[in-house]
Curated annotation (Swiss-Prot):
Chain positions covered by the region annotation CPSF4-binding: 180-215
UniProt subunit comment: Homodimer. Interacts with host TRIM25 (via coiled coil); this interaction specifically inhibits TRIM25 multimerization and TRIM25-mediated RIGI CARD ubiquitination. Interacts with human EIF2AK2/PKR, CPSF4, IVNS1ABP and PABPN1.
Domain notes: The dsRNA-binding region is required for suppression of RNA silencing.
Reported function: Inhibits post-transcriptional processing of cellular pre-mRNA, by binding and inhibiting two cellular proteins that are required for the 3'-end processing of cellular pre-mRNAs: the 30 kDa cleavage and polyadenylation specificity factor/CPSF4 and the poly(A)-binding protein 2/PABPN1. In turn, unprocessed 3' end pre-mRNAs accumulate in the host nucleus and are no longer exported to the cytoplasm. Cellular protein synthesis is thereby shut off very early after virus infection.
UniProt protein name: Non-structural protein 1
Disordered as annotated region, ranges: 205-230
Lineage: Viruses, Riboviria, Orthornavirae, Negarnaviricota, Polyploviricotina
Region described as RNA-binding and homodimerization: spans on this chain: 1-73
Residues covered by region (PABPN1-binding): 223-230
Organism of this sequence: Influenza A virus (strain A/USA:Texas/UR06-0195/2007 H1N1)
Length: 230
């Protein structure tokens, strides 16, 4: 098991515990409480997948955070916060690409958590790129405005957008929705790649093919799921 995966889970467990204490003192607003509930479900799922006890992971996460805070000077902390807390808005798409109307010959739609995934399953054997406009904080995707799938000819063949009835979404929500979209498009033998900007801030990584770091098994599973559920 990757040590980074374990330590990330441990820190996330401790930070969730801190946020829970904030909520218990009636200091959290509605979006804060909504994220707290959704993150709790996510942590339970991750804990089950990793085979880790959440209570133990929380204690270890506390030690990791305390060590970092002890080693970091106040001045370094101030500089980090000043640069990281400034939310940035990044654009893969032009205004025209975002606002352009499009239609589907074989429309398919799926609600993936707080996001809506739409695609045209009539599209086959195309090279497709996913572009998105979104905000970033702490060098991680914070809020997705709109994601669209484009063919080499510029036609729009898929889209992911937030549901107005579900305020707020996480980075994991976006990645899961992208997985559904990619699985559906690849089912029809399309080749899908993700823009470099989206790779960098959604996955904090990239690869030569332009695809997110899904394994072959994951892609096959997503394609099968998409066929039956979308």
């Amino acid at each position: 098991m990757d040590s980074h995966t374990v330590s990330s889970f441990q820190v996330d467990c401790f930070l969730w515990h801190v946020r829970k204490q904030v909520a218990d003192q009636d200091l959290g607003d509605a979006p804060f409480l909504d994220r707290l509930r959704r993150d709790q479900k996510s942590l339970k799922g991750r804990g089950s997948t990793l085979g880790l006890n959440i209570e133990t992971a929380t204690c270890v996460g506390k030690q990791i955070v305390e060590r970092i805070l002890k080693e970091e000077s106040d001045e370094a902390l101030k500089m980090t916060m000043a640069s990281a807390l400034a939310s940035r808005y990044l654009t893969d798409m032009t205004v025209e690409e975002m606002s352009r109307d499009w239609f589907m010959l074989m429309p398919k739609q799926k609600v993936a958590g707080p996001l809506c995934v739409r695609m045209d399953q009539a599209i086959m054997d195309k090279n497709i790129i996913l572009k998105a406009n979104f905000s970033v904080i702490f060098d991680r995707l914070e809020n997705l405005t709109l994601l669209r799938a484009f063919t080499e000819e510029g036609a729009i063949v898929g889209e992911i957008s937030p549901l107005p009835s579900f305020p707020g979404h996480t980075n994991e929500d976006v990645k899961n929705a992208i997985g559904v979209l990619i699985g559906g498009l690849e089912w029809n033998d399309n080749t899908v790649r993700v823009s470099e900007t989206l790779q960098r801030f959604a996955w904090r990584s990239s690869n030569e093919t332009g695809g997110p770091p899904f394994t072959t098994t994951q892609k096959r599973k997503m394609a099968g799921t998409t066929r039956s559920e979308i």
